[in-house]
A protein has these predicted regions:
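Alpha-helical transmembrane segments and their helix-start/interface "positive-inside/aromatic belt" motifs
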Residues: 2-22, 102, 168-179
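Alpha-helical transmembrane segments of multi-pass membrane proteins
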Residues: 18-39
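Interfacial helix-start motif at the membrane-water boundary
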Residues: 51-76
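Cytoplasmic juxtamembrane regions at transmembrane-helix boundaries
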Residues: 80-110
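Membrane-embedded alpha-helical bundles of multi-pass transporters/translocases
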Residues: 104-114, 183-191
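Membrane-proximal helix-loop-helix units in multi-pass membrane proteins
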Residues: 111-169
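Terminal transmembrane helical module of multi-pass membrane proteins
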Residues: 151-231
Length: 231
């Protein structure tokens, strides 16, 4: 099936582009401080996946980091929209009346739109509490919509998984189920921590942010390996 191959090929880029761009920005701001005009922007000696030494926003927001990150996120948003429509076509080919098709498109495309809006405002400094709240809400919507779309997709594939034996690696599908379930549980548990005002648990918040980001995009890496049989 042509749509399966397209979804497979596009999924690896949805993983690689954000992963490479955010970690490139991290390396630049920690190891190549001289390229940053404002030396207050630089970060020293941190591996935020383990120590939570800086947030993703703090890493990618300063110039020239955003010159890398913004285009990468715009491209990722575009690829996400294409990916979710490919998934829609795949589902229709197996069950054209499946009840989750519209939900998958709504939340999948919605997550891409939220990511685009967040990227547009990234790097724009505006000292206003309402503006800061707006950015946080948009980022929260991206996470909620993305995880919801992933959950509906995995649930849908499971509903006719016997029909997919010819096309899919069932072990990877189970891994995706475990991943999405973990992301949902972690999100529910960590909402009180993330929502806590001030700098309390700051490093834990940052650590969770980086690792959660990695978990969300790993879904697409697993997608690449899931459709690993010739179709």
């Amino acid at each position: 099936m042509d749509k399966i191959q397209k979804a497979k090929s596009i999924s690896i880029w949805i993983f690689l582009i954000p992963f490479i761009s955010v970690n490139t920005c991290l390396i630049l701001i920690t190891e190549f401080q001289w390229i940053f005009p404002n030396q207050e922007d630089i970060i020293h000696n941190t591996i935020p996946y383990f120590d939570g030494g800086a947030s993703i926003s703090r890493t990618v927001r300063p110039y020239p980091s955003w010159l890398i990150f913004k285009p990468a996120m715009f491209l990722t948003s575009f690829l996400l929209i294409k990916y979710w429509f490919y998934c829609k076509d795949i589902i229709i080919s197996f069950n054209k009346d499946h009840k989750h098709i519209k939900k998958i498109i709504f939340f999948g495309v919605g997550s891409a739109i939220a990511l685009t809006i967040h990227s547009i405002f990234l790097g724009i400094k505006f000292d206003n509490d309402l503006y800061k709240l707006f950015r946080r809400v948009i980022m929260l919507l991206f996470i909620i919509f993305e995880i919801t779309a992933q959950a509906y997709l995995v649930s849908t594939l499971y509903s006719f998984k016997t029909k997919l034996d010819k096309y899919i690696n069932q072990k990877i599908l189970k891994m995706k189920l475990i991943l999405v379930s973990t992301l949902i549980i972690v999100a529910i548990i960590c909402i009180p921590i993330i929502s806590w005002p001030g700098d309390n648990f700051k490093f834990l918040k940052h650590l969770l942010e980086w690792d959660y980001f990695l978990g969300v995009i790993t879904f697409y890496l697993l997608t690449f390996f899931m459709w690993n049989k010739k179709v």
